[in-house]
A protein has these predicted regions:
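Conserved S-adenosyl-L-methionine
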Residues: 88-189, 194-205
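Non-catalytic, mostly N-terminal accessory regions of nucleic-acid modification and defense proteins
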Residues: 1-106, 111, 164-173, 178
Length: 206
């Protein structure tokens, strides 16, 4: 039932301006994964408990407090997963402290950013921090890993970024730059230094 509900969310955007931002958003969610439990009952119990826990959260926070509970919870879960992922974590997550420093550096000389871009955006944490500190109206990013690409799009939506104000593309920035002709006020990046890469001759004059 939950899988059907998630599919309906994606399908509801077909033919709409938001179709590209929601298409395949939940494709990596595997409710049959053995990581959720050994039996179907175990899996159902775990998923039910998560939904009940979310239902207990008071989302009635006044707007003046500027607290994004869902977004903060999502960021926290990503950070906890990254903490146990070792070197691989650098491929999809930038610690908040590092994100803040990089964001503060790129906004020097700018009262307000028109847009911000990350060519290796991972889960989008660095992009969101730079956009927040720089008050950017538009967010652009590209991510090679399909699963991490979906994480980034979810991160944008859960932080209240309107689908019309962000564009995250799935693809290798070196092989197929989706924003080659676009001008940006600021560019931030924490490249996946632990990822394997072959320095092909075609990149020598890139």
């Amino acid at each position: 039932m939950l899988e059907r509900s998630l599919k309906r969310i994606e399908d509801s955007t077909l033919g709409q301006d938001s179709e590209e931002d929601f298409g395949g958003l939940f494709s990596d969610i595997d409710l049959a994964s053995p990581k959720l439990g050994k039996t179907a009952d175990d899996k159902n119990t775990l998923v039910s408990n998560v939904l009940l826990a979310l239902d207990d959260i008071d989302f009635g926070v006044e707007a003046s407090q500027e607290i994004d509970i869902l977004g903060d919870a999502y960021e926290y879960m990503i950070s906890q997963f990254a903490a146990g992922a070792g070197k691989k974590a650098g491929e999809f997550y930038t610690p908040q402290e590092v994100s803040r420093i990089l964001a503060e550096i790129v906004i020097i000389g700018h009262a307000r950013l028109r847009n911000v871009y990350d060519p290796t955006c991972g889960s989008g944490s660095l992009l969101l921090r730079a956009a927040s500190i720089g008050h950017a109206n538009e967010i652009f990013g590209q991510e090679k890993n399909p699963t991490t690409y979906n994480l980034a799009r979810m991160n944008m939506l859960l932080h209240g970024i309107k689908f019309s104000n962000f564009r995250i593309e799935n693809g290798d920035t070196l092989e197929a730059d989706a924003f080659g002709d676009t001008q940006f006020d600021a560019v931030v990046a924490n490249p996946p230094f632990s990822a394997e890469w072959s320095a092909a001759d075609k990149f020598n004059n890139d």
